[in-house]
């Protein structure tokens, strides 16, 4: 039986519009004239902040304390936020300033100002985590799609628990197809790779629009991760 106190999956996505070189262990491709910026989320989570009694998850006030320095890129309509789609390092204090905004929405902009509301951080995302963890623990290898509160999600299970053929058939070329379908308009859509301590893995797309259900990504081309695993 899975326990809430043994996993953590969070996402925080901010549009970045000023250049900073990515570390060598990340492979990304900047967006072109269609306004697509490659999504990379990589951050360290302090799972010790999780409730030990396994009954409570977290409140919005807890979120900044869980984040350490990380790299954040997102799918973005760069015509709204500027044409520079390079990444930037955003430290936890900058994220705190953004998250502490009354409407809890923000983009990291030049000068670390939270001046452009881009994504409402939905804590209902954690309810989706519950659903996915439950289904994967029961050996469900099907693609999962649904909606929770302010956002839509789509989840593709991968190895070691699920046959890689399922993963390849559902994700292969999906990003390109969706990009053509939406004419480059991927505003408010984000991609994650989930790794729960090696017990199960999956790729997850979340967004504010129902188009999320029809989008996918090639993980080999868009690297980044959120650890949702156990701690020693």
UniProtKB/Swiss-Prot annotation:
Cellular component GO terms held in the UniProt record: endoplasmic reticulum; extracellular region
InterPro entries per the UniProt record, alphabetical: CSS2_C
Keyword Ribonucleoprotein included in the entry's annotation: no
Keywords: Glycoprotein, Secreted, Signal
Record's signal peptide: 1-17
Post-translational modification: N-glycosylated.
Subcellular location, record wording: Secreted
Sites where a glycan is attached: 25-26, 53, 77, 163
Matches recorded under Pfam families: DUF6736
Major localization listed first in the record, in broad terms: secreted
Name of the protein in its database record: Secreted protein CSS2
Species whose genome carries this gene: Saccharomyces cerevisiae (strain ATCC 204508 / S288c) (Baker's yeast)
Organism placement in taxonomy: Eukaryota, Fungi, Dikarya, Ascomycota, Saccharomycotina
């Amino acid at each position: 039986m899975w326990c809430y106190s043994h996993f953590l999956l969070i996402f925080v996505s901010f549009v970045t519009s000023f250049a900073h070189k990515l570390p060598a262990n990340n492979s990304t491709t900047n967006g072109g004239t269609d306004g697509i910026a490659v999504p990379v989320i990589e951050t360290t989570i302090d799972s010790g902040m999780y409730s030990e009694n396994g009954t409570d998850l977290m409140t919005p006030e807890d979120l900044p304390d869980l984040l350490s320095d990380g790299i954040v890129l997102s799918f973005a309509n760069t015509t709204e936020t500027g044409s520079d789609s390079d990444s930037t390092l955003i430290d936890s204090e900058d994220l705190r300033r953004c998250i502490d905004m009354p409407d809890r929405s923000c983009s990291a902009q030049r000068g670390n100002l939270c001046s452009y509301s881009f994504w409402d951080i939905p804590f209902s995302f954690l309810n989706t985590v519950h659903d996915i963890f439950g289904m994967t623990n029961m050996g469900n290898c099907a693609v999962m799609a649904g909606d929770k509160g302010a956002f839509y999600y789509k989840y593709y299970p991968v190895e070691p628990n699920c046959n890689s053929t399922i993963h390849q058939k559902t994700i292969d070329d999906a990003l390109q197809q969706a990009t053509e379908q939406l004419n480059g308009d991927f505003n408010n859509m984000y991609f994650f790779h989930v790794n729960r301590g090696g017990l199960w893995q999956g790729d997850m797309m979340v967004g504010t629009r129902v188009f999320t259900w029809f989008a996918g990504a090639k993980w080999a081309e868009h690297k980044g991760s959120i650890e949702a695993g156990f701690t020693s």
